[in-house]
C-alpha cells in the first residue's frame, strides 16, 4: 500500500466520489455527499492505493492558525479493519506536525447509529479524545461530537 498526496483537483473529486459511493451508510445524503466531493477539489487530500486500486482517502481543512480538521475520511468497505485508516491518519499527522497544535474531527455522537459508533472507536484508537457535543449543530437526529488530538 502507498499513500500519496494528490494535487490535481479533478483527481481529488474523482477519488472522493468513488470512495463515498461505496459508503452509503455514512454518506447516503446526496447533497452533503456532493458537497464533500466539491469541497475536496480545494483541500489537501491523501489517498491510499494498492498498486493502482483506490482504497481510501482523507481531506484536511484548516479551522484556525492552531487547529486543522479532518474534513472527510473514507475507506472502501472491503478494506475496513486492515490498517488503511490508521495509515492515512499517520500520513496526515506527519504532514501537519509543526504546523498545528491540534487536529479535530466532527462525527455523529455515540448511541445514534452503529456505523458512527464504529467511527468514534476508530478515532479513539488513533488518539482522539471527545471534546464536546453540539446537540443541534447539524440537526436533532444527528448530534455533532467534536473530537480532538494534540499533534503539536
Residue ranges and their predicted role:
Residues 43, 142-146:
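Short hydrophobic/aromatic beta-strand or adjacent loop that forms the aromatic wall/cage
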Residues 66, 138-143:
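Short acidic/glycine-enriched loop/turn segments that link adjacent beta-strands
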Residues 1-30:
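Short amphipathic alpha-helix that is part of the acyltransferase structural core
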Residues 75, 81-94, 118-121:
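Conserved acetyl-CoA-binding loop-helix of GNAT-fold acetyltransferases
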Residues 47, 53-61, 69-74:
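Conserved beta-strand in the GNAT
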Residues 96-111:
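Conserved GNAT acetyl-CoA-binding A-motif
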Residues 66-77, 104-106:
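Conserved acetyl-CoA binding element of GNAT-fold acetyltransferases
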Residues 110-132, 141:
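Conserved active-site alpha-helix within GNAT-family acetyltransferase domains
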